[in-house]
Each structure stands twice: as C-alpha cells, then as structure tokens.
C-alpha cells in the first residue's frame, strides 16, 4: 500500500482529498495535519467521516514519518519548506496550492508577492494537467512518471486549459482575441471566513469579482502560451455562483478560418480526447451542464459556433473541488507512481 499524508487537511480541498483517498484501493491514509486543529480528531471537524476515519490531527512537522506521498493544500507561500523536506526524504510531494504552478518567478512575485525559497526545487517541479501535458512545450520535456514535485493546477486554469487545448494545438482560433467568462461555486474561495462568502452576501446573488486581477490569470496565460508556442494574453472575468461547488467556463474566440465547419472542430476535439478517462466532449447541440460533473473528476466540453460573428464558443464544466483540486491531484499521483490513471476516481457522478 502507498502511504499518503495530507497537510492542510481541514480546508475544503484537504477534506475532499481525504474523502477520495479513502476510496483508493492502493492507498493507506497515514498522517493528517492542520495548523488550526492540532490534537483534534478529523471527524470532529468533518462529521461525514464518522465510522470511516478516526485520526488525530498532527503538527505539520510530524507528517513526514513513514510516508510515501505528501499532499499539501495551503495558502501561497507556505509550500517551499514542505517540498524541500519531502525532496530530502525522497517523498513525492504534490502541491494543491499556487507555489509550484508558475514557470516565471517574476510572475509569482507580481501576482502572489512571494519569492522562490528553493529555486532548484522549482526547476524540478512539474506542472500537470494530465490530459494536455504532452502538448505543453515546457513540461512535456519532463517525465511525470518520475516526478518528485508536482504543481497541481488551479481550478480555473484546468477548466480553461482543457477547453482550449485542441483549438490551440490545431490553430483553429486567433490567439489574440480570447474572452473567458468563468463562474465558480463558493468553495473556490476556501474555508477561511470572508465577507463575500457569507450566506447572506452570496445567496440569491451573482456577480463578477477580481476583474482583470485574478491570481489565476498568469497561470491560464502560461498554460495556453505553452501549448500554442507563442505568448497569449486573455480577457478573464470570474464570477461567484451561489453554489457550493463547480465551475462553468464560457469561452469566446474568433476563428482563423471562416469556412471551417463545427462538425470538423467537433471531430478534432473527440479525437483529441479519445483516450482520456475524464474529458467528455458532448455531442453537437448539447450544452455542458454543471449538474452532471459534480462530485466527479470529469470535465464536460460542449462546442458551439456563431456564424454571424465568426466565433467559436466553448463551454466547459468541472467540479472545482475534484477535477479542479483533489481529484486531479490524485490523478497526478496515480500517473507519477505508475498506477491506473483513474484509480480511486472512476465513479459515476449523481444524476441529480
């Protein structure tokens, strides 16, 4: 059995990791840590774990003993020391935070206000959206199966990268005219108390936030640029949905070829993802719906064309806690350790 530990176990992504790992046939959940709840039982914090898990929450420094894999789900700037300890102990480290997502340290400084503490570790790290890493002109040179540090992608970049990768690889769209309108459930903001996620603030409300300044912007642009092979800038506007979980991204891009048919683009997308366990390209005429990916590691993509404006419109839906966080982290672990990619993740989402 693979011995797995989780740092930041009481945040939303950490709790989702625990839920999914408990169903993984190759994993033994070893140690859990939480800065806020050291000494408490995890099932005191999350009663859904009663009769499924009985573990005390440890100090972070106690996590590394008798462990093969460490997941960390922490705010930006807190993962470098953990990664260094894991690297020294030959433990696979998977970071669900932002510290190992950006290639360029200047971007990390500008958007997160931090510097790389161990620059050599950032050269070792692999950023992986598994379905499209082979098209990434930076990270496809590294072997995920031999990774020691994995930067798990953010939720918005995952939904957007999967939606746009086939169009960019096949040069269907003009790279300088991409508009992205994304909506996320409240769990995307984390468990920490914030005014805009109070029930009375977000219930029966719907509004954009962090317009033109969301921290996922450089990660989105990096992912798209690495795939296309040239620098890409996008217009990205996120919105807060009055839901617990899920992301819907609606993407608008001008077509390079006015004569291309939607069926040809659709066939290319179907072929692009034909071997993917988790990306579902819907039939022409169907529209991706958040309802059918919740609690799953699936990404649903629907394709549409506006002939009047020569625009390709792509709708992408994921569960931000699963494919956008914990599920994708487990998917990356599976690949890195030579397991079946869908191990512990191959379940059908509820219909309602």
From Swiss-Prot:
One of its GO terms (molecular function) is NAD binding. InterPro entries: AGPR_AS, AGPR_type-1, NAD(P)-bd_dom_sf, NAGSA_dehydrogenase, Semialdehyde_DH_NAD-bd. Its EC number is 1.2.1.38. One of its GO terms (cellular component) is cytoplasm. The active site is at residue 155. Pathway: Amino-acid biosynthesis; L-arginine biosynthesis; N(2)-acetyl-L-ornithine from L-glutamate: step 3/4. Keywords: Amino-acid biosynthesis, Arginine biosynthesis, Cytoplasm, NADP, Oxidoreductase. It is found in: Cytoplasm. GO terms for biological process: L-arginine biosynthetic process. Pfam families: Semialdhyde_dh (PF01118), Semialdhyde_dhC_1 (PF22698). Signal peptide: none annotated. PROSITE patterns: ARGC. SUPFAM superfamilies: Glyceraldehyde-3-phosphate dehydrogenase-like, C-terminal domain, NAD(P)-binding Rossmann-fold domains. It catalyses: N-acetyl-L-glutamate 5-semialdehyde + phosphate + NADP(+) = N-acetyl-L-glutamyl 5-phosphate + NADPH + H(+). Belongs to the NAGSA dehydrogenase family. Type 1 subfamily. Catalyzes the NADPH-dependent reduction of N-acetyl-5-glutamyl phosphate to yield N-acetyl-L-glutamate 5-semialdehyde. This is N-acetyl-gamma-glutamyl-phosphate reductase. The gene is argC.
